[in-house]
UniProtKB/Swiss-Prot annotation:
Coiled coil: none
Residues annotated to bind a divalent metal cation: 98, 108, 147, 177
InterPro entries assigned: Coprogen_oxidase_aer, Coprogen_oxidase_aer_sf, Coprogen_oxidase_CS
Catalytic residues (UniProt): 108 (proton donor)
UniProt subunit comment: Homodimer.
Site features described as Important for dimerization, chain residue numbers: 177
UniProt-listed GO biological process terms: protoporphyrinogen IX biosynthetic process
Organism listed in the record: Photorhabdus laumondii subsp. laumondii (strain DSM 15139 / CIP 105565 / TT01)
Protein name: Oxygen-dependent coproporphyrinogen-III oxidase
Length: 302
């Protein structure tokens, strides 16, 4: 089967958003997600959910959007001139979690589907997505667990899938103007449309459903670690890098803003607090320095 079933995809994305929100509420134990539904004049809309000031999660956002239109933004057609003049639909779930405890990493996950159609021609469609981890204080066993889970999700689809999408993730979440990675990576894929729709949809479902099994054990393991002002200040400083990447380099942010998406939802990925410090350097041999030497440089964790 190679004809995309848009209703089937939408149904999965909505149920995935529900499942992720329920599990995050359960582990936080205090706060609930609030929901805002929105419509877009050009076509489509979405539902944005956000949790604020939880016991564990300082802010967590989970967005579903399904937008359509007759003219793609420049961020989408720059590399694909064949899409000019096609009606399009873009749909996906995006998740960004900013914990309060600096020993718990920030995490991001996304699964998405895109289709562009023109009368008399075959539709152009693909899936994309992945997940990545941004620690402030690194733990080798967490990195190994994260990447082992990612590899196990990919393995049924071929032994070459994990290394390929891990490398893509390392390259994508790289802050070029800082010459450093945003975090320790994970998986990133895009333009997935072979061998057929069913294969690509199954893989995307496994990525979406597998994210929490990669992330929540790390949250559980680190949530009781005591922290103070030093750790908090370093966390806020590193969050500044997260902001820089999302506003300067992230294609999803650019696509959303250029296509007239809901700005509040697009910028939900921003941390509630961040800071900058001119010419900061961590103390040699410190836990903060270890992030730069032992965790941010791309490596094979497993």
């Amino acid at each position: 089967m190679n004809t995309p079933n848009i209703n089937q995809i939408k149904s999965f994305f909505l149920s995935l958003q529900d499942e992720i929100c329920q599990q995050l509420e359960q582990i936080d134990g205090k706060e609930k997600f609030t929901e805002q539904c929105w419509q877009r004049e050009e076509g489509g809309g979405g539902r944005s959910r956000i949790m604020k000031e939880g016991t564990i999660f300082e802010q967590a956002g989970a967005n579903f959007s399904h937008v359509s239109g007759d003219m793609l933004p420049l961020s989408a057609t720059a590399h694909r001139p064949e899409l000019v003049g096609r009606h399009y639909q873009a749909m996906g779930v995006s998740l960004v979690i900013h914990p309060l405890n600096p020993y718990i990493p920030t995490s991001h996950a996304n699964v998405r589907f895109f289709i562009a159609e023109k009368e008399g021609e075959a539709p152009v469609w693909w899936f994309g997505g992945g997940f990545d981890l941004t620690p402030y204080y690194g733990f080798k066993e967490d990195a190994i667990h994260w990447h082992t889970t990612a590899r196990n999700i990919c393995r049924p689809y071929g032994e070459d899938v994990y290394p390929k999408y891990k490398e893509w993730c390392d390259n994508y979440f790289y802050i070029k103007h800082r010459n450093e990675a945003r975090g320790i990576g994970g998986l990133f894929y895009d333009d997935l449309n072979t061998p057929d729709f069913e294969h690509c949809f199954n893989f995307t479902q496994d990525i979406g459903k597998g994210f929490l099994s990669a992330y929540l054990p790390i949250v559980e393991k680190r949530k009781e670690i005591l922290w103070g002002e030093r750790e908090r200040q370093f966390q806020l400083y590193r969050r500044g890098r997260y902001v820089e990447f999302n506003l300067v380099w992230d294609r999803g942010t650019l696509f959303g803003l250029q296509s007239g998406g809901r700005t509040e939802s697009i910028l939900m990925s921003m941390p509630p607090l961040a800071r900058w410090e001119h010419d900061y350097h961590p103390e040699p041999e410190s836990a903060e320095a270890a992030l730069y030497t032992d965790f941010l440089p791309a490596k094979n964790w497993i």
